[in-house]
Amino acid sequence: TGYKSNHRQDLIRSDDRNFRPVDLEFAPDGSLYIADWHNILIGHMQHNARDPLRDHAHGRIYRVTYPSRPLVKPADIAGAPIAVLLDNLKLPEYRTRYRTRRELRGRNVSEVASKLRNWVDHLDKNDPKFEHHLLEALWVSWGINKVDEPLIRQLLKAKDYHVRAAAVRVLRYTGHQVPDQAALLMQAAKDEHGRVRLEAIVTASWLDKEQGLKILNEAEKLPLDEWMANAHETAEAHLSGTSVEEKKEEIVKTHLKGKDLDLYTKGKAIYSREGYCNTCHQPDGKRLSASGFS
C-alpha cells in the first residue's frame, strides 16, 4: 500500500562542506533549479536561530540541464484561452499540468465548468491515458469548487487503482457537494487494492462517528498491511473520541548495571525523541540513506 524508494544515484554533489541544497523546482522548459542555502550550519534544530554564523543574505541557485537533449517548449499558460489550458492537461510534464490547474482556478467558474465538460466529452476513450485525462479534469472541477459528480462516480470505478485512490481523496474534501459520500466510501472500503482502501480509511475519519466506523469496519474485512493498520487504528480512535494506546517499549537487553544502566536509559530516551538524534540517524543508527547525516 505504501511507497518504497531505492537510491539510484546522486543527481548533484559537492565537496564544499557548506553545500546545503534545500529546495528544487522544475522550470517550464524542463530544466531543474536547485536552491543552495550554502551555510556553515546544518538544519535549524541543532543551532540557535540567532547564531551569528546563520547567513540570511547569501545563497546559490544551480540550473541543471541535459546538454545533448533539447529543452521542453514552455506551454502557454498565463492568460491562455481555456481551451488551450485544458489541452495542457494532456502534456507529460507534471509541473506544467499543475501550473495549468492553478491558472484555471482563477478563471470564471461557470465558463471553466462548461468548457471542461465539453473537453471531457470529446476525449478519445481509446487513448491509453484516457483515465488520467479524466482525473485531471476532476482535479480542475475540484479546483474551481464545483466538483463534477458524474466524473467522480465514474473514476471511483476506474480500471487503474491509482485513479480510484485519487478519486477517493477528492471525495474526502468535497463531501459537502456529494450527498451520498458515505455510500461511495463504503464501496471504496471494499476495493481490491489496498491503496484505495487506505484512502477510504483516512476519509472515513472525516465523517461522523456512526458513518465513519461502519466504513472502517468494512475496510478491515480485508487484510490491513502496516500502512493501513496505523491509519485504521488512528481513525478509529479519533471517531471514538479516544487516544491511540502507546505501544509498550521493547526492553533492550544490556550488560550495563547501576549508574551505567541509568545513564544508558536516559540517553536512549533522548535519542528517541522526535527532532533529536533519532530523526536523522534513525532507530537502527544507520541514518537516512539520502540525508547526508552519518
Region spans (language model):
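Beta-propeller domains with acidic blade repeats across secreted/periplasmic ectodomains
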Residues: 1-85, 105
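Gly/Gly-Pro-rich "capping" loops immediately C-terminal to redox-active cysteine motifs
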Residues: 48-52, 282-294
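C-type cytochrome heme c attachment motif
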Residues: 59-60, 269-283, 293
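Amphipathic alpha-helical scaffolding segments comprising HEAT/armadillo-like alpha-solenoid repeats
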Residues: 78-86, 109-124, 145-157, 176-189, ...
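Alpha-helix N-cap/helix-start positions at coil->helix boundaries
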Residues: 94-95, 125-131, 161-162, 179, ...
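Alpha-solenoid HEAT/ARM repeat scaffold
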Residues: 98, 132-135, 165-166, 198, ...
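Structural signature of alpha-helical solenoid repeat scaffolds
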Residues: 105, 139-142, 172, 205, ...
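Electrostatic cytochrome c docking/interface patches
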Residues: 245-272
